[in-house]
A protein has these predicted regions:
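Flavin-dependent oxidoreductase catalytic cores
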Residues: 1-396
């Protein structure tokens, strides 16, 4: 019988167990987007803690796709490969697979960060980043982005990563192409689900020509809060399309950034937002008592607080044969066991529990702990805008 600690494989890559560290922005790259010694040590700690596999924090495939969050990884130049090779070799010493998540932030950034205009499938302003209306990508610009994703996959392979994960969730560029909420085009890149999926399909086709059977995973939304966003019915179609496009495994998440704490449930960290968020810093503090209830109503996380992507993962797993990974509000060892034993998913992924306890998998395995110490205060999610990721445990 399968259980959370049984050995398993993704695209032939052996995992010691079925618990994965989901992609988490650490804010520990250097000024050029190369991994630093401090970041490598964080990954070594995860590997020593016996995690099944690590998915790195996101790495941008080109300069105009760079995140406004501090010290993002970049995979936009060949010169970066040796830095990543060092990272991979250090993690592999502990027999832990590591996958590089690659992305383009699209409209979820600032032109002052990238030095270029923000871009998107459609000229729709992001409500959270509040940047100028993004430039609508042309055919040739879309083709250049596809090329950059493919080259990034080639670089990841050369660096020794066990595979890559395409970031198709949370409102970043590929996510915004997939979502009818953000993609209002009426050409071959918009309209039908097939057209909105076209950019992902092209990335997969061209990547397979270059790297053949190199593992390519994807992280996608099972649903979005926006009325015209992706719903489960369309997520099933996208998942089937990913399988047809030779994707090796799919991680199920939800939500986009401007929808607030949909994809990362828990407490509404107003004090942390007031101190770190660029929009709040422009407002007079005298208005904070009036702003707080409005923001909490608009952006606070909905229910349920835990296992909130499980229903989507169950339905998607029924429709595809490749492995399904579920992330979101997984905090108890019992839940991890149940999801795997009941075959509701093939793997589980966590993010915040690893921020507070890099060795949580080892503690689970040795039965020293039954639940994560994470209190879902979400301070870490806001603090990383300006400082490297850490657990605040609900305190400033």
């Amino acid at each position: 019988m399968k259980d959370a600690f049984s050995e398993s494989k993704i695209a032939g890559i052996k995992l010691r167990n079925r618990i994965i560290r989901s992609a988490t922005h650490e804010g520990l790259a250097d000024d050029f987007g190369n991994p630093t010694e401090e970041l490598i040590k964080k990954y070594e700690d995860l590997a020593k803690g016996e995690v099944g596999a690590i998915i790195t924090g996101y790495a941008a495939v080109m300069q105009n796709g760079k995140s406004p969050l501090i010290n993002m990884l970049m995979i936009d130049k060949d010169e970066k490969i040796p830095y990543y090779t060092e990272l991979v070799d250090r993690v592999h010493q502990y027999n832990t697979p590591i996958f590089l998540q690659i992305t383009h932030c699209g409209r979820q950034t600032f032109s002052r960060t990238t030095g270029m205009p923000t871009v998107a499938p459609s000229p729709i302003k992001d409500k959270l980043y509040n940047e100028d209306i993004p430039h609508e990508l042309t055919d040739s610009e879309i083709d250049e982005i596809i090329k950059c994703f493919v080259i990034a996959i080639e670089r990841a392979k050369k660096a020794g990563f066990d595979g890559v994960q395409l970031q198709l969730s949370h409102g970043y560029l590929l996510s915004s192409f997939l979502s009818p909420h953000m993609n209002k085009r009426n050409d071959k890149w918009g309209g039908s689900t097939e057209n909105r999926f076209r950019i992902v399909k092209k990335i997969m086709e061209r990547a397979r020509e270059k790297v053949v059977d190199y593992p390519i995973l994807a992280k996608m939304n099972g649903y979005e809060k926006s009325k015209d966003g992706i719903k489960l019915e369309e997520a099933l179609i996208i998942a089937r399309n990913l399988e047809k496009a030779s994707c090796d495994a799919i991680e199920i998440s939800c939500g986009i950034a401007e929808e607030g704490f949909v994809g990362i449930r828990g407490e509404f960290p107003f004090d942390m937002i007031a101190q770190h968020n660029h929009l709040m810093q422009k407002m007079p503090k005298i208005l904070y008592p009036f702003i707080k209830p409005v923001l909490k109503h608009s952006f606070a996380s909905p229910e349920p607080r835990y296992l909130y992507n499980l229903d989507s993962a169950i339905e998607i797993k029924k429709n595809i044969k490749i492995p399904v990974i579920v992330v979101g509000g997984i905090r108890k060892l019992e839940d991890a066991y149940n999801m795997i034993q009941r075959e509701q998913c093939d793997f589980i992924a966590m993010s915040r529990p690893f921020i507070i306890e890099p060795t949580i998998v080892k503690k689970f395995k040795e039965n020293k702990q039954q639940q994560s110490k994470c209190i879902d205060c979400n301070y870490c999610q806001i603090g990383v805008e300006k400082t490297p990721v850490k657990c605040y445990y609900g305190k400033m």
